[in-house]
């Protein structure tokens, strides 16, 4: 396809294939913000999160695609759907004369990688998780490059060309942010930020609700991002609950520590702000990948990991109380994260896309 390119002096054209959850979409958005002169279009799946986030910024193409779970007959149907989606993506790529593709994995990545390979369009695949997803494991070798959020991922991708870059987060996570005016937390008071995540927040919220009275009694403020799930703890002037907030960067920069799920994007935000964390992985994540993410984060000296269980209720309560009582321990964990944090990954991935375009034009 590249042999029939349009005017070579025109801006590079990028197709972004990122769909479903914030963990797939927000890193891609952070990357394309670094490419203001490029012509960018987006590929997603109908009725997913990208339908709310993307159309005001970039043209959005939609292709039906789902996962591989289910009976043999359902899997056969998935193969038929994959073939149909690959042909649709091939048509989008050919008619749009795209120079390069960026995908962040997930369902939409499979037809995108296959279609791009059939046309000779180079693909940069970014994998945020420590344990890569099935599409990355199966098709990473067909990509020009697989950019990794964590170094540990490379061992799972034999045959793929990999580069460790970190996981892209929005620029504000690297820039000092003022604490929002609606959170009048006095300087020096400890702050615990709880991030339930967009999926499976209910179990984590239940544990935190049971522990919060002890932390409040110890003098902490708690900002609890519930993900929309009810938590039901008594009202308290130093406890603030919100379904979501857009100013997570400011909260994490101010936090003493966080209590969080272990999605790759959440960990990247904690890493970028050097925020120590008690990690409670979502127990129903595919292939338990959040637990693997958490182990990688903890291995850098940034916190502890515990399973979601009522049996761990007292462990969670006492761990947070110990951290509140030992600020020097928390400070050391923050220093560990600062020392191991990669540079801004969004810029690194943008540079890799630029390199791929230059190499392909030769």
UniProtKB/Swiss-Prot annotation:
CDD domains: GT28_MurG
InterPro entries in alphabetical order: GlcNAc_MurG, Glyco_trans_28_C, GlycoTrans_28_N
Binding locations of UDP-N-acetyl-alpha-D-glucosamine: 21-23, 129, 170, 198, 290
Major localisation: membrane
Enzyme class: transferase
Catalytic activity from the UniProt record: di-trans,octa-cis-undecaprenyl diphospho-N-acetyl-alpha-D-muramoyl-L-alanyl-D-glutamyl-meso-2,6-diaminopimeloyl-D-alanyl-D-alanine + UDP-N-acetyl-alpha-D-glucosamine = di-trans,octa-cis-undecaprenyl diphospho-[N-acetyl-alpha-D-glucosaminyl-(1->4)]-N-acetyl-alpha-D-muramoyl-L-alanyl-D-glutamyl-meso-2,6-diaminopimeloyl-D-alanyl-D-alanine + UDP + H(+)
Cellular location(s): Cell inner membrane
Superkingdom of source: Bacteria
Keyword Protein biosynthesis: no
Keywords from the UniProt entry: Cell cycle, Cell division, Cell inner membrane, Cell membrane, Cell shape, Cell wall biogenesis/degradation, Glycosyltransferase, Membrane, Peptidoglycan synthesis, Transferase
GO molecular function: UDP-N-acetyl-D-glucosamine:N-acetylmuramoyl-L-alanyl-D-glutamyl-meso-2,6-diaminopimelyl-D-alanyl-D-alanine-diphosphoundecaprenol 4-beta-N-acetylglucosaminlytransferase activity; undecaprenyldiphospho-muramoylpentapeptide beta-N-acetylglucosaminyltransferase activity
Presence of keyword Endoplasmic reticulum: no
GO biological process per UniProt: carbohydrate metabolic process; cell division; cell wall organization; lipid glycosylation; peptidoglycan biosynthetic process; regulation of cell shape
Cystines in this chain: none
EC code: 2.4.1.227
Membrane topology: Peripheral membrane protein
Pathway: Cell wall biogenesis; peptidoglycan biosynthesis
Any Gene Ontology CC annotation: plasma membrane
Family recorded in the similarity comment: Belongs to the glycosyltransferase 28 family. MurG subfamily.
HAMAP family linked: MurG
Function: Cell wall formation. Catalyzes the transfer of a GlcNAc subunit on undecaprenyl-pyrophosphoryl-MurNAc-pentapeptide (lipid intermediate I) to form undecaprenyl-pyrophosphoryl-MurNAc-(pentapeptide)GlcNAc (lipid intermediate II).
Protein name: UDP-N-acetylglucosamine--N-acetylmuramyl-(pentapeptide) pyrophosphoryl-undecaprenol N-acetylglucosamine transferase
Species for this entry: Synechococcus sp. (strain JA-3-3Ab) (Cyanobacteria bacterium Yellowstone A-Prime)
């Amino acid at each position: 396809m590249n042999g029939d390119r349009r005017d070579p002096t025109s801006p590079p054209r990028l197709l972004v294939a990122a769909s479903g959850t914030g963990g797939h979409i927000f890193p891609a958005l952070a990357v394309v913000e670094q490419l203001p002169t490029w012509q960018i279009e987006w590929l997603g799946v109908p009725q997913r999160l990208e339908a709310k986030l993307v159309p005001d910024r970039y043209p959005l193409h939609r292709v039906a695609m789902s996962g591989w779970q289910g009976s043999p007959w359902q899997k056969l149907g998935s193969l038929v759907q994959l073939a149909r989606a690959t042909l649709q993506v091939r048509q989008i790529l050919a008619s749009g004369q795209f120079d390069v593709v960026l995908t962040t994995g997930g369902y939409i990545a499979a037809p995108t990688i296959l279609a791009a390979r059939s046309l000779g369009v180079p693909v940069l695949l970014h994998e945020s998780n420590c344990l890569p997803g099935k599409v990355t494991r199966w098709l990473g070798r067909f990509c020009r490059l697989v950019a990794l959020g964590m170094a540990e991922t490379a061992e799972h991708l034999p045959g793929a060309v990999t580069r460790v870059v970190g996981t892209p987060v929005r620029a504000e996570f690297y820039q000092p942010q003022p604490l929002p005016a609606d959170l009048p937390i006095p300087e020096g008071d400890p702050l615990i930020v709880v991030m339930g995540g967009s999926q499976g927040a209910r179990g984590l919220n239940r544990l935190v609700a049971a522990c919060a009275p002890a932390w409040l009694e110890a003098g902490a403020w708690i900002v609890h991002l519930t993900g929309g799930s009810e938590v039901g703890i008594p009202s308290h002037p130093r406890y603030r609950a919100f379904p979501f907030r857009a100013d997570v960067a400011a909260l994490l920069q101010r936090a003493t520590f966080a209590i969080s799920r272990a999605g790759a994007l959440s960990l990247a935000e904690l890493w970028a702000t050097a925020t120590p964390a008690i990690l409670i992985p979502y127990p129903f994540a595919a292939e338990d990948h959040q637990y693997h993410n958490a182990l990688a984060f903890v291995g850098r000296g940034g916190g502890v990991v515990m399973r979601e269980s009522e049996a761990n209720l007292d462990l969670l309560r006492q761990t947070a109380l110990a951290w509140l009582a030992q600020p020097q321990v928390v400070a050391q964990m923050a220093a560990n994260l600062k020392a191991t944090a990669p540079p801004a990954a969004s810029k690194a991935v943008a540079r890799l896309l630029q390199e791929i375009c230059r190499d392909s034009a030769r």
